[in-house]
Amino acid sequence: MGIAIWLKGMRPQTLPASVAPVVIGAAAAWTSIRQLGVCALTYPAPESCAINRATQTTLESRFWPLAILCALVALFLQIAVNFANDYSDGVRGVDEGRGAASPALPASPASSSSAVPTGTPPAAVVLSGRRDGIAATSIHAPARLVASGVPPKRVLTSAGTAAALACLCGLAIVVITGHWWLLAVGVCCLLAGWCYTGGRHPYGYTGLGELFVFVFFGLVAVLGTQFVLCGTVTATGVLGAVQAGLLSCVLLMVNNLRDVDSDRVHGKRTLAVRLGERRARILAVASYAVAFVPVAVMALSPLVLSALSLVGLPCWWRTSSWVGINASGEQESGSSGGWACALPSPPDTLTWAMAAYGVVCLAIAALTIRALLRRDHARALPLIGLSLLVCAVGYAGLAAI
């Protein structure tokens, strides 16, 4: 077997789901570290200012080594999970017919073009025919290692090697930070990765995959990275964790939507199988929109407000209270109101840069939602991964301002 099949076995389209949350967590941590240097302009300076600056210096000195180690932990864990998933599904027979050299299977009459909605691209057609008793998978389902003839033990060994590399990087993080309880978090991550499709009762076969992905690729990955880098968790980190978790869930949901017919035949009751193809697709689109569209809206809002200010908007009703002395020497009070409008504010370079970022986000969102609605899973998967990376770039950009 050549190296190409091993690279495909790593499932590169899923790797952004591991690296992007680390970038988001690192960006949130960098913002917190910078705020440690802010001190009240009082004399003499409070003692807390000196303590905060010393802490800031320490955190900044080890920021990049720890950030790189966090990224490597996430990357190696994702690769280990992908190999373990390939092994478990392969030995169970779920991936039969998904070898590197497996020919495309002809559609049965039940899945002929007459049953496909007009305008549906070829990528959306899921074959429901059977050959030699094996259920067919979707046309664009990627090849799997075990199904391609790679010995299962070699795939399992590769998963163990990737997991061991993740553990080494994790141990380095523990030694540097002194947070020994992170070892327990690492064990939970390893167990979650293996039990997705491994063991006697894999939770990926019962529709709980998305829940665990939200927890480990969202909350744990983002907030864990932030805590490792700055020793605290902030609202920015929580928001980023929710967004990363939702987008990672959508990535898994689309993957399962692509394989929904094959999974149903093999008894793999993913969330897509439990909900049904239509409802699962609606949930995927809604989750994606909730997680990613607000990023574009927030990026475009400064330009919109700037444009409105140039035409005398936005305006609001302003009420003011007053207290005075009348002619009789008695105190009087009252209130008055009137319209107030924002002063004209031409957009600056930062506003234009954010607007350009927002336009890119809107374009990606439109293409992704279109691909999801048209059942074009081959195009939707990389677009969702790109959305994760673009979201991470946005957080990194805000942290750098």
Predicted features and spans:
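Topogenic membrane-insertion module of multi-pass membrane proteins
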Residues: 1-43, 47-52, 59-65, 69, ...
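Small-residue-rich segments of transmembrane alpha-helices in multi-pass membrane proteins
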Residues: 21-25, 211-226, 273-277, 382-397
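Membrane-embedded alpha-helical segments that form the functional core of polytopic membrane enzymes
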Residues: 22, 35, 58-84, 183-194, ...
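Acidic (Asp/Glu-rich) catalytic motifs at the cytosolic membrane interface
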Residues: 76-103, 122-129, 134-135, 249-272
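Intramembrane alpha-helical segments
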Residues: 140-232
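Functional transmembrane core segments of multi-pass inner-membrane proteins
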Residues: 212-260, 266, 278-282
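Extended hydrophobic alpha-helices typical of membrane-associated regions
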Residues: 300-307, 323, 329, 344-401
